[in-house]
Structures are given as structure tokens and as C-alpha cells.
Amino acid sequence: MAYTALELITRAYYLSQVISRELQVPSGTQITDGLYLLNAIIDFKNSDLREIPYYQEFVFNAVQGQEKYDIPGLLTVDSLTFNIGPVRYAMNEETRTSYFANYRIDNVQSLPFQYRVERTLDGADIYIYFVPADVYVMKLWGKFQLTEAALTTDLTQFYDLFYIEFLRHQLAVWICSEYGASVPDLVKENYEILQKKIMDVSPPDLSIRSLNYFGNDPGLDWQIINLSGGWLPY
């Protein structure tokens, strides 16, 4: 069953108690304001990734000799790998200082093993090193920008019903702020409960994998990458 943005806006107005459910129907400026606020909420979530519960896979081809790749709509990357045939290789994310300010030999073409993600307008740039020596199929898992809505947009095509309910409560809070009204206590309480639950839907992977240069397993360094061609007996 479709759940349009117009229906969400209408229900948010009733929830905010700015208009009466039995006596009024939002129209005109109220609908325009509601759509603006809804899209402002959706856009603002790009700055607080904890409130975006959806991870997506994105596949692109690395180009021989190219370090930088523009990924539209990308917000953050959890993992980045590449394939040579059926064999998958992992890559390590570097800090900005480590990637851009550390010593290294530029333009070395080999198997990439490091990457750095930098946010840009409406997306992100991914930098990889070593510069690819061939065309590799890159696979990333990350979070992308949420889809903005028109009045007729069926929100169930993009969001779960629990997330739509969260948006309805948040929109009700913003409507109260826009119209100078007090947020009903129960609405505020339910919104805070929903917000906490949303952050627990898909928490980030905070596990740590360490490389031990003094243990039984080999560490990943420049010599291994270049001398072995990246083929390790894992």
C-alpha cells in the first residue's frame, strides 16, 4: 500500500496539533511548508549518519593509472574491496594525514591496498593507492544520501514503515518549531524513543583487525604487494 509524502505531511500536522484532525485539512502554504521541512529533514540526515539505517553496495571499475574516483551520493564507506577474477582483496582505510601527508612514491602502479574517502558536494571522492595497474572491479559498502520527496512520492519505495513513522514524528516537531507552537509532551517522548531505536538498527562495524609483524601471519607492506603481486596464502 502506497504511503505518499502528502499523506505523511498531513499526518504530521495532525500529530503536531498545529491543526485539528476533525476540523481542518492542511492545504496551500501549509503543504508547501511541510514538503520543504520534510526534505530539509531528509537532507540534514546526511550530516548525522547514525539516523540513516541503510547500507548499500556500490560497484565501480578502477581505471589503470587513476587514483581519484567520484561517487555520487556517497556519504561514508564501511569497506572497500576489489576483485581479480574470483579472488577478492581487502583494502585499508587511511586517515587524511596518513594518506595525503605521509611519505610515499607517487604513481606506482600495482595492486591497491589503501584508500581515503573525502566528502564533496552531493557525494564523495575515493582515493586509492597504489594506483591501479589494471582495470579492477571495486566493491564498496557504505551509506548514501536519502531520496528527497515530491508530494506524490511513494515513500515505501525507499523507506521502511518504521522509518516513515520516525520521519512523521520528526516532521511534527519541526512543524511546531516553524509555527512557534509547543511540541506536545507525548510527541516529544515518542520521537526521542524512535530516534534511539533508529540508531540501533544498523550500527557501524567497530571491530578492529590488527596486523602483527612479529607473529606467524605476514603483515601487508610495500614489499609483499610488489614482490608477491598481492597473492598471499590466507
Residue spans for each PLM region:
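Glycine-enriched, solvent-exposed interface loops adjoining structured elements
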Residues: 1-234
